[in-house]
A protein has these predicted regions:
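Negatively charged
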Residues: 1-132
């Protein structure tokens, strides 16, 4: 298991992609993503992880990702039980600000135990590309 730092200090634009991929029991993620790097690529940041807790759910955090890639950020994860509403609302704010929706495609692809996400994952949802 990788030790999660207390802050984003030390992360650069070149090392955010897959930074925590395939980790287990990530329970000490910083409660705030304040100071996260302005990376153009957060793709697969937590892909394949299990037991993720402590993911910030504030709308503002997710809106701040701007046009950075968050493709497959949580793909193939298990036990994602955090409330998706602030995340999705933040992503919606980002997209309504002119940023492209495709940068979040497959964000939750292959995930299991998405008990709070069914309304967002439906084929008719504007968020459906995040789940396929």
């Amino acid at each position: 298991m990788k030790k999660i730092p207390d802050s984003w200090e030390g992360f650069t634009a070149s090392n955010c992609n897959s930074a925590f991929a395939n980790c287990t029991s990530l329970t000490d993620i910083p409660s705030s993503w304040e100071g996260k790097p302005s990376s153009p690529n957060y793709a697969s940041l937590f892909e394949g992880c299990t037991s993720l807790t402590g993911i910030p759910t504030a709308q503002e955090v997710w809106a701040e990702f701007g046009n950075a890639s968050i493709v497959r950020m949580f793909a193939n994860c298990t036990s994602l039980t955090m409330d998706p509403t602030p995340i999705m609302d933040g992503l919606n704010r980002r997209e309504s600000g002119g940023y492209s929706a495709h940068i979040g495609s497959q964000m939750f692809a292959g995930c299991v135990n998405l008990q709070h996400y069914s309304e967002y994952a439906s084929p008719t949802s504007v968020y459906s590309s995040y789940f396929i």
